[in-house]
Amino acid sequence: MAIQPPGSNTKANKKGAKKNLKIDTFSKKEWYNLKAPAIFPNNVCGKTMVTKSSNKQNLALLLIGRKFDINQADLTGNLEEHARKFSFRVNEVRGKDCIGVFDGMHMTSDKVKGIIRKWHTLIEAEKDIVAKDGTILRVFVNAVTKKTPTCTSKRVYCKTSEEKKIRKVMFDVIEEELKGEDLNKIMKKLAAEVIGKSVEKKGSLIYPLQNCCVIKVKTVKRGKDTSNAMEIEAN
């Protein structure tokens, strides 16, 4: 006869057994609103949750530093601007609102892939600029050569010397438009594609260009006065 190990007799342990009570995990969570800068018409982006472990716990410390991406079409209500996404970082908590500050921008992958053309020259440039509050941003710009009506060849390649001149134009435009500006103005220029239009206008004097746009903006170093640089609606 096999010997049962201690505790295996369920009938004998029924009297002292404890019931496993199901705990609703969502009852310990609190919801907060995610808000973008007030320069956008629809600055309430969504909600985020945080787990509350005790009544004395400061939940703001758990929320500060969280990042979220929002499509520009959702921020402005214009569906034609769906190819651009802005990144924000929670820098302050006011009541139930998480105030986000600019943390970067990038184009969607399908838009970036659609810029490239076969038998054309792709010109890329990246440059670091310093904003008004000391934030260091790395800006990436792309441009593609354009076929003119008088061109008979299917290959539209520019010379290396022309490519260097166009890249120099990109550097100058990035520095002229963004250097020393506050983050609100930088976001407005990125949303309106001011840099891409200026690069296409000035660079086309060297060689015809198309699809000139800022594909990415990366935050290399955050400034000290980021919270004061952003004017956010409290309500």
From Swiss-Prot:
<feature type="modified residue" description="N-acetylalanine; partial">
    <location>
        <position position="2"/>
    </location>
</feature>
<keyword id="KW-0687">Ribonucleoprotein</keyword>
<dbReference type="InterPro" id="IPR027500">
    <property type="entry name" value="Ribosomal_eS1_euk"/>
</dbReference>
<dbReference type="Pfam" id="PF01015">
    <property type="entry name" value="Ribosomal_S3Ae"/>
</dbReference>
<dbReference type="GO" id="GO:0022627">
    <property type="term" value="C:cytosolic small ribosomal subunit"/>
</dbReference>
<dbReference type="GO" id="GO:0003735">
    <property type="term" value="F:structural constituent of ribosome"/>
</dbReference>
<keyword id="KW-0689">Ribosomal protein</keyword>
<comment type="similarity">
    <text>Belongs to the eukaryotic ribosomal protein eS1 family.</text>
</comment>
<comment type="subunit">
    <text>Component of the small ribosomal subunit. Mature ribosomes consist of a small (40S) and a large (60S) subunit. The 40S subunit contains about 33 different proteins and 1 molecule of RNA (18S). The 60S subunit contains about 49 different proteins and 3 molecules of RNA (25S, 5.8S and 5S).</text>
</comment>
<dbReference type="InterPro" id="IPR001593">
    <property type="entry name" value="Ribosomal_eS1"/>
</dbReference>
<keyword id="KW-0007">Acetylation</keyword>
<keyword id="KW-0963">Cytoplasm</keyword>
<protein>
    <recommendedName>
        <fullName>Small ribosomal subunit protein eS1</fullName>
    </recommendedName>
</protein>
<dbReference type="GO" id="GO:0006412">
    <property type="term" value="P:translation"/>
</dbReference>
